C-alpha cells in the first residue's frame, strides 16, 4: 500500500464530507447518533468478542497493565458508549448559534456564529471507546473526522466503525464523515499530522511518547495534554471522612487514567491523624507510598513505604504508586501544585469556604475541584455527553473537550447598505 497516496485520498474524502456535515440539520445528526447507540446495544456480543481477540493478542505481546485496562471493553463500558451518544443527542446543537450581537455607530450589526472546525484527526492507542466518543461528538458538531486507532484495538475499532457507518447511512449523512484508517502502519500517523490542507486539528489520545512525537512533527494544530499529574490537598480544615473517601477514590478507582491522583499533599496539622487512616485503606490495594521525610516518619511500619525522590513529584505513575508530601499550609500546597502539576486536575478537601475559593483562583489547572475526587474530570461526568479528549493547554480548548471545543467562532455582519467613510 502506498501510505502517502492512501492518506491523501482519505483526507480528500474527509474534506468533501466536512462541507456536507457543516450544513447538515440537527435532526439528521441526532438520528445518526441514535442509530449508532441502538446498534452498539444490539451488537454488544459482537463487540465483546472483537475486544477479546484484541486482548488476547495484547497479552501475548506483553502490553502493560495500564494499557490493558484502557483496552478492555466491559459491559459497563459498552453501555456508557451508548449512553454517551444519547446524551449528545440531548445536547443543544451549537452550530449556527449567533451570539454577542451589537449595533455599531455606523449602523452595522456585528455578532459571532459558531461553526465546525472542519476535519478533525484523532490519534489514539488502546482506547476503543474513543472511536465512538469521537465519532459522536464530531457528528453532532458538524465535523468530519479521521480516526487512527492503535493496532492493539484494531478488531474492536473495525467493529465499532461498521456501526458508525451504518448509523450515518441510515440518517442520510455521508459515510466519509467518519473514516477509520485501515492500516496499522505507523507511517499513516506521519501523513495525517502533516496534511494541513485536509486536516484542521489533531486530537491525540495516548501515552507521553506519542504526544511528544506529535508535538515535534505535527504541522496541524493540536488539542492535547501531555501528562496527568493530579493532586489532592487535604487541608487542616478538612472533614476527615470526606478526606478518606476522596483520597482513596482519586488514587484507587482506576490506576491507568489521566485524572488519577499521583501526589497527595497533607497539611502538617492534620497529617498525624489522617495519614495512618489512609494508609490502612491503601494497604488493602497494596499501594506503594513514596513519602517525604515527614510522611515516612508518620507512616513507619507501612508495608509498602519508600522515600520519594525529586523525580517522583513530576511523575505520572499510572500504577498503584502514590507520592505523599506533608506541607505546612495551603500556601505551600498551592506552590507545590503550580510547580509540579501538569495543569490537568487538582482538588482540595476543606470545610473552609475562603480557602476553597482561594484554591480555585490560584491553582492554574484545567479543572480545579473542592471536596471531590479528581476522577470526576471527565466529559461524561461534566455533562458533555462524552469527550474527545482533555486539554491542559490554554488556547482554544481547556479541560474536557466536548461539542463547543470542536467549534470556532466567525464574525457575522448585518448591514442595510452601509459603506465605510
Curated annotation (Swiss-Prot):
Pathway: Amino-acid biosynthesis; L-proline biosynthesis; L-glutamate 5-semialdehyde from L-glutamate: step 2/2. It catalyses: L-glutamate 5-semialdehyde + phosphate + NADP(+) = L-glutamyl 5-phosphate + NADPH + H(+). One of its GO terms (cellular component) is cytoplasm. It holds the Pfam family Aldedh. It comes from the Bacteria. It is an enzyme of class 1 (oxidoreductase). This is Gamma-glutamyl phosphate reductase. The gene is proA. Its EC number is 1.2.1.41.
